[in-house]
């Protein structure tokens, strides 16, 4: 994964690439560079479990407790949801908008009391906690972020929901059991195109015959 530039500078190399942008004919250097990049992207785009873990850790597990403070700056304070909010008419705060989204998803899933629920990509657990409280059901949340799982487990104890909601540090391909409802919100972007089929097959294997799956992406 190295490029060695001889008898020139990095600036000259980059300027040569820029000069060729938009041209019908590109220089040999530009063509070779483009091909190298294409091969690199192809080889590194295989999102196997180990690679997925590294990607998630790089994005979410930044600086330990200090990293958590970064997310505190822009996430809603009540649920700590990272995905987009639902700003329906009359909504005034981010907290209200995220609650709108939770209520909308819960309604779509048609969750019944006592059902087993799986959240793929649970984030900081806000949606799992809300569903458990609203519907009195058993919720399992999975994530590849150590920081998120630690936060979720501690929060579950604080809320007195640790006997109803559990969180596991596993990949979706490693999940076990059968669930009445499965949902995934804002996580599908991490899957990678080459693994779409594997993702849906994994969900299908985890879903009961009469179950429902909701994908928000």
Each language-model region and where it sits:
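Conserved class I S-adenosyl-L-methionine
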Residues: 113-121
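Conserved beta-strand signature within the Rossmann-like core of class I S-adenosyl-L-methionine
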Residues: 210-217
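A short glycine-rich, Lys/Arg-flanked "PGG" loop and its adjoining helix->strand segment in the class I
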Residues: 197-209
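Conserved SAM-binding loop of SAM-dependent methyltransferases across substrates and taxa
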Residues: 124-136
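A conserved beta-strand element that flanks and buttresses the S-adenosyl-L-methionine
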Residues: 183-188
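Conserved SAM-binding loop
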Residues: 152-153
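Conserved Class I S-adenosyl-L-methionine-dependent methyltransferase catalytic core
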Residues: 4-108, 112
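A short acidic, Gly/Pro-enriched loop at the edge of an enzyme's catalytic core
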Residues: 173-182
């Amino acid at each position: 994964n190295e490029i060695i530039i001889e008898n020139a500078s990095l600036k000259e190399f980059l300027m040569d690439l820029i000069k060729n942008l938009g041209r019908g004919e590109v220089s040999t250097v530009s063509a070779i560079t483009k091909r190298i990049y294409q091969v690199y992207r192809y080889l590194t785009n295989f999102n196997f479990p180990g690679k997925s873990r590294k990607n998630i850790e790089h994005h979410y597990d930044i600086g330990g407790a200090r990293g958590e403070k970064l997310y505190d700056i822009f996430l809603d304070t009540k649920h700590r949801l990272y995905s987009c909010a639902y700003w329906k008419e009359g909504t005034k705060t981010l907290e209200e908008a995220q609650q709108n989204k939770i209520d909308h998803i819960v309604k779509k899933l048609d969750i019944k009391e006592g059902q087993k629920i799986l959240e793929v990509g649970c984030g900081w657990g806000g949606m799992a906690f809300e569903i458990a409280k609203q519907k009195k059901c058993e919720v399992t949340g999975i994530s590849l972020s150590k920081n998120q799982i630690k936060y979720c487990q501690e929060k579950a104890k604080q809320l007195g929901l640790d006997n109803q909601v559990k969180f596991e540090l596993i990949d979706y391909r490693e999940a076990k059991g059968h669930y009445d409802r499965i949902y995934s919100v804002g996580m599908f972007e991490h899957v990678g195109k080459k693994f779409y089929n594997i993702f849906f097959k994994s969900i299908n294997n985890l879903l009961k015959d009469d179950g429902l799956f909701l994908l928000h992406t």
